Amino acid sequence: MKHYPHYLDLKPAMHAKGVVRLPGSKSISNRTLLLAALAQGTTHIRDLLASDDTHVMLMALQKLGVKWEQIGESQDYIVHGVDGSFPVHQADLFMGNAGTAIRPLTAALAVTGGDYTLHGVSRMHERPIGDLVDALNAIGTHIEYTGEPGYPPLHIQRGRIHAHEMSVRGNVSSQFLTALLMAAPLMTREQDVIINVIGDLISKPYIEITLNLIQRFGVEVQRNGWQSFTIKAGQRYISPGNIHVEGDASSASYFLAAGAIAGGPVRVEGVGRDSIQGDVRFVEALEQMGATVRMGDNWIEAESNGVLRAIDADFNHIPDAAMTIAVAALYADGPSILRNIGSWRVKETDRISAMATELRKLGAIVEEGEDYLKVTPPAEILSAAIDTYDDHRMAMCFSLATLDGAARRGNKERINDPQCVAKTFPEYFEAFAKVTEESLF
């Protein structure tokens, strides 16, 4: 895996053009690993993402007694399913800062039973998990906090499930609902499971990914809009045999935005019209800003069509990819407003605060609300040292501030702690350098 120095100096780039093969989707990779582990049968996973977060999941599954093999040096894996019951009933599991690992694993371990501790880096212990724990403990699982209530670390012990209807708030993180949906088939041997959503559900496209993958592993979920989900009794996860992980649509956003800002065309391969990821709808925002976008079944291409137009839009459905729009707004013809992004506050860092702070370093005027950002672009983007807050998306987003270098020849940008991109895209800066035709150092 690529290792970067403590900082990376990026030079202004005049133009962006080229083709990028995307790494696998983080959301799909970690869901698929857990489903394959819980299934009956053996699953061949192709093009799994190589990253810190998938490594966390693989190591946790190994500690739980799940057998898996990597095929040579490829990103193809064989996972031998345990048919709903982990062989190891006592384990200490390190979760890093991987929300896509700790939340589904918490639910699966709580309903199957055992003696487990789950902990991570310091930021993980600041990310809320109380709504998920409350939903599970209400039906008889036994999950305790070993630190601050409502947050990891967690201690899971064997409980006694006495109910099969759960309720969870939908407005904090969609990963709580994902975790319950993935764990539900482990409880349906004799009785239906019903999951109710309290209030509005954010990030609905991520739930679509979950439902799609659960179905691929043989379980049907009946739904009443976004308010309730029923998993009928008698179902279990069954391996589909082979499954392919499509490219990461959130990672695609940086390259497509580069094409929209600095000429293009820039094409990403591995995700396209047939994607199950909601973040492909990022291109709708680029089109609103005036970019030209083309899509195939497994590729997307974007190019500039003049100066980007300012945008005022609701980004609740694509919170991760929306970060890219915040930086692209530096190049717009007026103030842009990103609305309904409150979930940014509980991600790898408080992304609203972090984004506002770093955009101001570049000369932007930024108004920060509880769930929105207003970005007024500067006349000229300033040189700056960008802090990344151990957040992979902050590092990748702000590489875009090096574009359109003709207008600000001589300005430079420094990315502090570039190694944080290893969470989802270890080779990101090499890929970005290829499409901007600039050396890294």
From Swiss-Prot:
Q: Which reaction does it catalyse?
A: 3-phosphoshikimate + phosphoenolpyruvate = 5-O-(1-carboxyvinyl)-3-phosphoshikimate + phosphate
**Top-level taxonomic group:** Bacteria
Q: Name one GO molecular function term.
A: 3-phosphoshikimate 1-carboxyvinyltransferase activity
Q: Which is one Gene Ontology cellular component term of this protein?
A: cytoplasm
* One matching Pfam family: EPSP_synthase
- Name the positions where 3-phosphoshikimate binds: 26-27, 31, 173-175, 203, 320, 347
Chain positions recorded as phosphoenolpyruvate binding sites: 26, 99, 127, 175, 351, 393, 423
Q: What is its main location?
A: cytoplasm
In the record, biological process GO terms are: amino acid biosynthetic process; aromatic amino acid family biosynthetic process; chorismate biosynthetic process
- Asked if the keyword Cytoplasm belongs to this entry, the reply reads yes
Return the CDD domains for the record: EPSP_synthase
**E.C. number, please?**
2.5.1.19
- Which of the seven top EC classes does this enzyme belong to? transferase
Where is this gene product found? Cytoplasm
The pathway to which it is assigned is: Metabolic intermediate biosynthesis; chorismate biosynthesis; chorismate from D-erythrose 4-phosphate and phosphoenolpyruvate: step 6/7
Q: Which residues form the active site?
A: 320 (proton acceptor)
Q: InterPro entries attached here?
A: Enolpyruvate_Tfrase_dom, Enolpyruvate_Tfrase_sf, EPSP_synthase, EPSP_synthase_CS, RNA3'P_cycl/enolpyr_Trfase_a/b
Protein keywords: Amino-acid biosynthesis, Aromatic amino acid biosynthesis, Cytoplasm, Transferase
Provide the assembly information: Monomer.
Give a short account of what the protein does. Answer: Catalyzes the transfer of the enolpyruvyl moiety of phosphoenolpyruvate (PEP) to the 5-hydroxyl of shikimate-3-phosphate (S3P) to produce enolpyruvyl shikimate-3-phosphate and inorganic phosphate.
Q: Which NCBIfam families match?
A: aroA
Q: Write out the similarity annotation.
A: Belongs to the EPSP synthase family.
What protein name does the entry list?
3-phosphoshikimate 1-carboxyvinyltransferase
Give the species this sequence originates from. Janthinobacterium sp. (strain Marseille) (Minibacterium massiliensis)
